[in-house]
Amino acid sequence: MASRVNIVQVQILDNPAMFVDKFKLEITFEVFEHLPHDLEWELVYVGSGTSRDFDQVLDSALVGPIPEGRHKFVFDADHPDISKIPVDDIVGVSVLLLRCKYNDQEFINMGWFVANEYTEEELKENPPSQPLIEKLSRKVETEDLRITTFPIRWTDEDPVAEPVEDEANRVFAEDDLMPLNDDGQEDDDEEEEDDDEMEANAEEVDLNESFNERLANALDGAEQKGADEKMEDDGANEDVDMADDEPGVQINTDTKVPESMAEPLSDKTNNEMVQ
């Protein structure tokens, strides 16, 4: 079934910033039908690309009930707990995830690379064995956004949807792309030449490929639902002009708030809206 929520834009505010500064995300989204229950937003910092044990939920917020229309709010969260991150993964590239759920069902997962590096050249060239957190800067790479969507049941009447593979977006395995021919000997010779070239270039590392693999591991480990990955260009890149008089919804990080108490969201953070 079609999603009832479209993420129009997520803007990372105060970016770049120092590592110890708060994360601030301005989120604009559309609701196509009235949602009687809350949307649950969750910001996660991936402490290591090798294990989900180091993932940290920085903060979460409940937004709702939500009337039909376009809405905007600012979601802020504290920086990650440095003691829960492996020392070797503090400086370098990590991942920031924004998840959204409805009725405890995750329907979208957005991910960005995060580059953590020292601000002083001397520390960049000779990094200390124990990272100096107060000297670290943080930059969320907003130009490289990854989005994973999942089909969910928006109402009790909705059937349980089975993920359907889109041939246009299918990622083929390398074996699927091999040409079919009967020249077995020529294939063997070509494979040997390829192996020689790979050995000659073994010391060359494609950092982009390494970073992409790290983010892919983080996104794949977040939810094992077998859903397809696709990009929503209109959600990631569209510039949004928000009217000052648009209707808003109530945000609460602890408890749900009735629709009658909803307030406009413009220019407010999630913490400021909690009564």
Curated annotation (Swiss-Prot):
Region (Disordered): 157-275
Pfam families: ASF1_hist_chap
Ranges of Basic and acidic residues composition bias in the record: 265-275
Keyword Transmembrane helix recorded: no
Superkingdom, taxonomy of origin: Eukaryota
Biased composition (Acidic residues): 157-166, 183-207, 230-247
UniProt-recorded Gene Ontology molecular function terms: histone binding
Compartmental location: Nucleus
Keywords carried by this UniProt record: Chaperone, Chromatin regulator, Nucleus, Transcription, Transcription regulation
Entry's Gene Ontology BP terms: DNA replication-dependent chromatin assembly; egg-laying behavior; nucleosome assembly; nucleosome disassembly; post-embryonic development
Annotated GO CC locations: chromatin; nucleus
UniProt-listed PANTHER family: ANTI-SILENCING PROTEIN 1 (PTHR12040), HISTONE CHAPERONE ASF1 (PTHR12040:SF0)
Quaternary organization: Interacts with histone H3 and histone H4.
Family of the protein in this entry: Belongs to the ASF1 family.
Function of the molecule: Histone chaperone that facilitates histone deposition and histone exchange and removal during nucleosome assembly and disassembly.
Protein name per UniProt: Probable histone chaperone asf-1
